[in-house]
Amino acid sequence: MKPSEPSKETPFTSIVLADNDKLILETIGELLRSKNYDVHLAHDGLEAWKLVRDIRPSCMILDVVMPKLDGSRVCWMIRQDPALRDTPIIVFSSLSAQDFRHFPDLSADAYVAKGEICMAFQNILRAMTHLQAKGRADIAGGILGYDEVQPREIVAEMLLEIRRYANVLNALGPGTIELDTDGRILRISAGACEILGRSETQLIGEPVTSLCADRDQKTLLHLLRELTSGAQSERCKATVQFGELEIPIQVCSILDGGRCTGALIIMESRGKKVDAQG
């Protein structure tokens, strides 16, 4: 499918800017506002995904390495959504051009290297001007500031660990769901998507309790709050109704550096259909 070129017709007005570096986020955000753009800030990938769906901006600028969801996954989900897939995306990152080969789902339309803030901002403006003049089909003129950025071995190592982690999750049971401390879905296995009857892009960012039967929502919410408020690894079992299925689950807290950073739901089976008369 060829990318459409909305920017040739309509100038950029609203922008979602995503970066976990607070100083960069606020500085670039203010500079963009000084050019009369309507700027919405996201501090992590999950927040960026929510803003893109809620606002449907005319352009998105995002870092690659971010908490909760990396920029590559955000890009991939945008391109999977029929209502969002033509959104112009500018990657703004300290990664090198060679590092990007480790992110095959990073389907951005322009790439701007981080660096001295004034120069980086000018390059962002150039990338936006290029996209508005040439459309999404011409990426060559939208690669800016990478002449002196060197690849880093740690990026490849980080990606290997992420893939290994994803493979471990897929091996844990028929379906697995990783949550943040607010109970929102960060990662979900293909098996869990199939069991729940919804796609990954529909589920990422959703509160897991919203997928449960009404009678189980408060119980699961209380369970998650208990697990994520502790400083020790905890595990418990429950049976929860998702749609028409009753599914036995294990819920485990995820600890990092002595604090809970989220929870993992492991579906122990594909469940059984609830008797409507029961």
Predicted features by range, described:
Residues 156-196, 201:
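Sensory modules in modular signal-transduction proteins
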Residues 212-243:
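Terminal output helix/cap of sensory domains in signal transduction proteins
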Residues 43-47, 58, 70-76:
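Acidic catalytic/metal-coordinating carboxylates
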Residues 21-43, 47:
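Two-component/phosphorelay signaling modules centered on CheY-like receiver
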